[in-house]
């Protein structure tokens, strides 16, 4: 194993190989850190809706093993439509140049919620004529509202081995769970974990927390839909026990 670090001192010539080392170490570190993560949102990319424009903040996305760095905000105009609109990120690779390979990404709105092989979803919304699109939420249950709100439950968020919830969803959950009466030790521990990790929590931890409360969903492993539904019930009813039945519903659009 060998690692080379350029010595940036006066009167020394900076060779092109040294420049490559500087380039590769900075990017290679991120590649190693996120090597076990699925495709999806890694950092940032906060979405705001204002005056008919969606603004996607700076951040990092992973797609097909490559990490895309967004160093500038992106803007996408929107307007009401008779149905769901999906904000998608689309990725392409350009190898036409002999000097470099270009990894490109763009954001756009699509009336089709299905995804092509080179796309991922950032959020979706159903904006009615005469209504205002919201990007903030009254409470955790409000995040599953169908109309006139940025819906994050379907967002592609990178996780270890499987996708996870958008950090905004879990931070709202911890905010409400943290002030709930009759909290158990596991509830407090989960809140601290969410706060310390800024909402970046793996799905396995949420399932374990729910199972510790005696909440199950039959014999199948709980997916994001079921986990969200059970979390909402905990906030609505307090610390519930017993088994969870599939007959209960939540607004969760695939």
Name these PLM-found stretches.
Residues 4-8, 61-254:
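Beta-strand-rich solenoidal segments
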Residues 1-60:
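N-terminal "first-domain core" detector
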């Amino acid at each position: 194993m060998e690692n080379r670090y350029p010595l940036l001192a006066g009167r020394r010539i900076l060779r092109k190989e040294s420049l490559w080392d500087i380039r590769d170490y900075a990017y290679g570190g991120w590649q190693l850190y996120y090597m076990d993560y699925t495709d999806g949102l890694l950092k940032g990319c906060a979405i705001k809706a204002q005056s008919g424009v969606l603004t996607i903040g700076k951040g990092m996305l992973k797609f097909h093993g490559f990490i895309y760095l967004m160093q500038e905000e992106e803007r996408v105009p929107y307007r009401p439509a008779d149905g769901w609109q999906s904000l998608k990120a689309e990725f392409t690779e350009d190898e036409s140049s002999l000097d470099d390979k270009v990894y490109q990404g763009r954001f756009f709105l699509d009336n089709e919620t299905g995804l092509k092989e080179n796309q991922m979803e950032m959020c979706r919304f159903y904006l009615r004529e005469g209504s205002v699109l919201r990007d903030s939420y009254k409470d955790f249950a409000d995040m599953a509202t169908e109309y006139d709100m940025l819906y994050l439950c379907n967002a592609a968020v990178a996780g270890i081995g499987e996708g996870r919830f958008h950090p905004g969803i879990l931070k709202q959950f911890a905010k409400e769970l943290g002030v709930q009466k009759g909290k158990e030790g596991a509830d407090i521990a989960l809140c601290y974990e969410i706060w310390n990790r800024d909402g970046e929590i793996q799905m396995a931890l949420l399932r374990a927390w729910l199972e510790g409360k005696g909440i199950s969903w039959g014999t199948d492993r709980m997916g994001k839909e079921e986990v969200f539904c059970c979390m909402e019930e905990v906030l609505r009813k307090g610390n519930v026990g017993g088994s969870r039945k599939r007959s209960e519903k939540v607004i969760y659009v695939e």
